[in-house]
Amino acid sequence: MAKSSLSLNWSLLVLLNFLGATLSTGTDSLSCELTFNHRTLHGQCSVNGKTLLDFGDKKHEGNATEMCADLSQSLRELSEGMRNQQSGNDALNVTTQSQYNQGEFIGGFWAINTDEQHSIYFYPLNMTWRESHSDNSSAMEHWKNKNLEKDIRNVLIIYFSRCLNKLSPHFREMPKSKIKVLDTTQNTNTTQIHPTVNNSQHNSDTQGLSFTWIVIICIGGIVSFMAFMVFAWCMLKKKKGALCCSSSSTT
């Protein structure tokens, strides 16, 4: 009985340690507000509300453009490729929002602002495009390009993941950015995220939370099963002992 109780306690300790490690890692939320002008890239990217990259101020505290040089370079090359595909010379505004679990991309999108009110969205996990409005279908077809899709996918899934893994965990301790996010209420070309697409983003944002609950439920089921097995074993031993005593007294 004492041996089985010790075994159960040890198993519970292992499971709780695993659960604690899972919950403590959580997910990282990445967001970028970028503007592609002629030969220049402006804007910043933040993780969990803290500045990760700032292309407008190299001296900004917490800026990791040098530590994540491959990411910075890939973003600049991507901006050049997008400008080459763009019709006209207007500034191109891009917004991206994505989620990472222990540095691994689990969901998100890359949004291209087509005018003051509409955007088109690329989802790298399933390599699909969506428009915020049906009138944007022609603009979406214009941006569909295999090389562009591959470059966006590499930036979000490969280069951002490498940067997060390289800077984790100390980048989470950096002070929060004091730079204001671009004002989307003004009449500018800033990318606007529409409610119809926010639902999709919300689904990807909650994937990490769903994973955590799945782990909790599985661990709870394992613990309950182990407790039941120990209880059944103890009851069986007790029943056998009672039968032995009964047969001895009869004899």
Curated annotation (Swiss-Prot):
Transmembrane segments: 213-233
Cellular location(s): Cell membrane
Segments on the Cytoplasmic side according to the record's topology features: 234-251
Keywords: Cell membrane, Glycoprotein, Immunity, Membrane, Signal, Transmembrane, Transmembrane helix
Topology class, membrane: Single-pass type I membrane protein
GO CC terms, sorted: membrane; plasma membrane
Signal peptide residues on this chain, from the entry's feature table: 1-24
InterPro entries: MHC_I-like_Ag-recog_sf, MHC_I/II-like_Ag-recog
Chain ranges on the Extracellular side, renumbered to this chain: 25-212
One annotated GO molecular function: natural killer cell lectin-like receptor binding
Claim: Translocase is one of the keywords in the record: no
Gene3D superfamilies (UniProt xref): MHC class I-like antigen recognition-like
Description of what induces expression: Up-regulated in response to infection by murine cytomegalovirus.
Tissues expressing the protein: In strain C57BL/6J, strongly expressed in cardiac muscle and skeletal muscle, with lower expression levels in spleen, liver, kidney and thymus. In strain BALB/cJ, weakly expressed in cardiac muscle, spleen, kidney and thymus.
Function: Ligand for the KLRK1 immunosurveillance receptor. Binding to KLRK1 stimulates cell lysis in vitro.
Family to which the UniProt record says this protein belongs: Belongs to the NKG2D ligand family.
Protein name as annotated: Histocompatibility antigen 60b
Upper taxonomic lineage: Eukaryota, Metazoa, Chordata, Craniata, Vertebrata
Gene behind this protein: H60b
